[in-house]
Amino acid sequence: MQRYLISYEFNDGEDQEIGGDMLVKWYETGGVENRPETYEVHSWVFMIQNGTGHCVVSADSLDTIWILWHPWRKLMDISIQPCLDLEETISLIKKTRP
């Protein structure tokens, strides 16, 4: 599985409020338990004061990520980028050095 950084920012305060309600409903109806085995969250942070957040996940494909994130797409700008953790970064640097 590939590791990804997902960054997001709500369009405005109203969309953030709608998104918050959606998140609570998703969470209370077993959202975490219903994630596919091919999607793992490593960390998640949300700065509620400005409506932005970031999470690091591992997933088998971008399709898996978009299936999970599509309900929020109209409420926020979402950016997904491949990333590495510290050990993966060190390993890559060592492999590229002579």
Question: Whereabouts are the PLM-identified features?
Answer:
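Short active-site oxyanion
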Residues: 52-54, 77
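Short S/T/G/P-rich N-terminal loop/turn motif that feeds into the first structured element of a domain
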Residues: 1-52, 60-64, 88-98
